[in-house]
Amino acid sequence: MDSNTITSFQDILQRMSKMQLESSSADLNGMITQFERLKIYRDSLGESVMRMGDLHSLQNRNATWRDELSQKFEEIRWLIAECRNILTKTENSFEQITFLQALQLLLEVESEIRTFSFQLI
């Protein structure tokens, strides 16, 4: 995985964990958890692509990997919508920068996951 992507994930997660949004902290914690799960999924998919021989074991171990992939895209769309929602409501520049960067990272990760998944098909 690209070291910039790792740093971006870590930076955004760290900044989000320090925030207190007007919405509930449960919403923010849910977003943080989703980001962490997305990072882990992206990493594992990327590793599978690098070891193309793992494609068959991936398919055998998880016959529903396409359903899982679809679910991850739904999660990405949900996170994008949440980031946009927060951006429309907040006037705090720290939050704006954080969520703009999170939005950019989500779009990059979505593109990477699409690329990985096409390589696995």
Curated annotation (Swiss-Prot):
Coiled coil: none annotated. One of its GO terms (biological process) is exit of virus from host cell nucleus through nuclear pore. It holds the Pfam family Flu_NS2. InterPro entries: Flu_NS2. A motif (Nuclear export signal) lies at residues 12-21, 85-94. SUPFAM superfamilies: Nonstructural protein ns2, Nep, M1-binding domain. Keywords: Host nucleus, Host-virus interaction, Transport, Virion. GO terms for cellular component: host cell nucleus; virion component. The keyword Transport applies. Belongs to the influenza viruses NEP family. Interacts with protein M1. May interact with host nucleoporin RAB/HRB and exportin XPO1/CRM1. This is Nuclear export protein. The lineage of its organism: Viruses, Riboviria, Orthornavirae, Negarnaviricota, Polyploviricotina.
